Amino acid sequence: MFTQNHFEIFSIDGLEARMAEIRSEIQPVFSEIGQKLLTKLSAKISNQEFYFHIAQHRRRTANAPENTWSAISTKARGYKMEAHFQLGIWEDYVFIYLSMIDQPKKQKEYAELLTNLSVEKMLTEDFIISKDHTKAEVFPLSAFSEAAERLGKVKKSELEIGRLWSKERFDGKEDSKILAEMLETIDQLLPIYQKLMEV
């Protein structure tokens, strides 16, 4: 599980230095938790193969990443072309999202489906959304409908929906509780994910 030390990695100066710590310290935690999420998904959707990915930030040549993430998708060679699950970390929180980023192939179809779903009624109030995977800013679930409409109208728009856990909770005392909440987050998002996979 994540610890306070993992959040401090985002204070390290320099691309190479920060990436070295991300690889050695954060990515093993992604793998540990990610395998549990993968097992949960495979059990719930037994007729589908799922693959675990870790963001490598290979395109970066100067600026160190302000966040990093892992992903679960049905594609062996990538994840951004379809709706997928993400487990990631910023300097002040950890998140799990159902993500549609970087112009997935069925972006318009996803948007049409989501604008007609009563997503706010399908999820508990502690769910939040992100409109840009490169920014830490999040919005309440009440902003979902507007963001879903934008996903269909603006080519470069993005939509992520899920939960976050503030860094203060990662003191080692709540690890099992946080993991249970993460697995339950996948459970709540699954009905939406399954509908997206059908379009």
From Swiss-Prot:
Signal peptide: none annotated. Disulfide bonds: none annotated. Transmembrane segments: none annotated. It comes from the Bacteria. SUPFAM superfamilies: YktB/PF0168-like. It holds the Pfam family DUF1054. Belongs to the UPF0637 family. This is UPF0637 protein LACR_1918.
